[in-house]
C-alpha cells in the first residue's frame, strides 16, 4: 500500500486513518509504505507524528529536497524482512552513490535542534497566509489543503497576466473561463512574496 503524506492535493492522513491502513495491510498481507517527500508539512498539519510513522509503517522516507537539501531522501526501513539485501539492491539498480555519506550530512543537519520541523511550519504558515488572502479576495479553492500546496480557482484572464511573474501548475479547467491551479510555498518563501502575489491578485480582480 503506497501513500503520500501529504497527498498530491495537499491533504493529510490522520493517525486514525494510518492505523486503519495498517490494519487493512495486515489483513491482506501487504506492506505499508509512506512517501514523505513533503513530510515536514504533514508533520505540522496532521496529528500523525514521526513516531506514529515509525510504529505503523513498514517503510517511509523523510524528504530532503523540499526542505532545502541539495539531493535525496532518507529511507527508513522498519520491517526487518525488507532490510535484508537492501544495500545490494540499491547498488545493483544503480542507486548507490559514491561518497553517499555526504548526503547523510544534510539529514543530520535537518534533524538537529528541530530544524526540519521548523521548516515545515514555515511552509505551512506561508501557505495559510496565501490561502486566507485568496479567500478574502472572494476566490474559491478547489481543495481544502492544510499544507504548503494551495489550489485556488482563478480566472484565466488573471492567470494570463500573472504568468510572467509567478510560477504555478494548472490542475484542472473548472469551466470555460476558470482554472484550478496549484501554488506551493517553500522553506524559503518570504512574507513579502506572499504579499506581492496577493496584491497582484487584488489589482487584477
Briefly describe each language-model feature range:
Residues 128-203:
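Conserved C-terminal alpha-helix-loop-beta "cap" of PLP-dependent enzymes
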Residues 1-36:
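Active-site phosphate-binding strand-loop segment of PLP-dependent enzymes
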Residues 31-33, 59, 180-182:
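Structural preference for beta-strand elements that scaffold enzyme active sites
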Residues 1-13, 49-147:
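Active-site C-terminal subdomain of aminotransferase-like
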Residues 7, 38-40, 66, 187:
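Active-site-proximal loop/turn and secondary-structure-junction residues that shape catalytic pockets
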